[in-house]
Structures are given as C-alpha cells and as structure tokens.
Amino acid sequence: VLLFFCLCGYAEQKKQSLVYLEHSETLSFDEKRLPDVQILVGNVCFRHDSALMYCDSAYFFEKDNSLHAFGHVHLIQGDSLEGWGDVLYYYGDTKLAKFRRNVRLLHDGATLTTDYLNYDRAKDIAYYFEGGMIEDSINTLTSLRGQYTPYNDQAVFSGEVRLVHPN
C-alpha cells in the first residue's frame, strides 16, 4: 500500500501544465522546413498558468510545450510582474523564460534592464549574465551578472558592481 501512495505522489509531481495558444491572426505550417511547428503571425497571445505572453510572431512547438516569440514580446505574470524584450524562448515544462535583446523586467517599481535575461517562473528567479541595471525610485545599480527574486525583493550582484544613490 505504501508503494501505491509513493507512486501516486511521483505521478502528481511529474504533471505539467500546458502552454495554450489564445490568439493569432494567422496560423500556418511548413512541414518540410519546420516539422511539428505552428507558425503564428499577428497579435499572438499564449497563456501558461497565471502568465500571458504577447508577441508579433511566434513558433509554437506544441509537442514540446514550448515557443519562440519574436517582436514586441510582452509577458504578464499576475498583477505585479511584467517583462518585455525582442525575443523570448519559453519552455512550459520548466517554466523557463529566456528573454533576449532590449529586455526589461518590471516589478513593484523596480526595473531591471539587460540584453540577456533568464526568468525561472517556477523558482521566481531572474538572472542576467551579460551586464544589467536595476533601478528603483532612488537607486541605480549596475553589474555584469545579477540574480533577482522579484517577489522576495532580494538580489545578488557580481562583476563590476556599481551603486548610484543620491546621498
């Protein structure tokens, strides 16, 4: 009987939520060039759990529960965290969002900007590794690498860390 309960618990842990396509102006396929990929263009919107993701165009890998989003990428999670970038690689099974180029992450008045940001939605950790800046109403901090936990308001920085404060 104990083995049955252990296996049920394991099965529950392995259960993944699916990424859903909410909207796209056009949907096409190119089985020769991009097998098993949905090619989406125009006001594309995806939903994954509590997050919405918007973009101009995307490749949706439904079998892999992942997507590549391009142009005016915007992620909204709950009512207090938003992210923007030119490109987003999103992996639904791990809830990992990889933003690239012109990236901004906004949470409760703090803005993180960089060109390379990975946001682990499952662990609520955003990290950058090619230089970044975090600003709030009074401070500006720059560093080469950083790790930011938005909902705990905790951050760790390394590599040429510089803090600018009015006092």
Descriptions of predicted regions:
Residues 10-167:
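N-terminal amphipathic/hydrophobic interface segments
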Residues 2-11:
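Hydrophobic h-region of N-terminal signal peptides that target proteins for export
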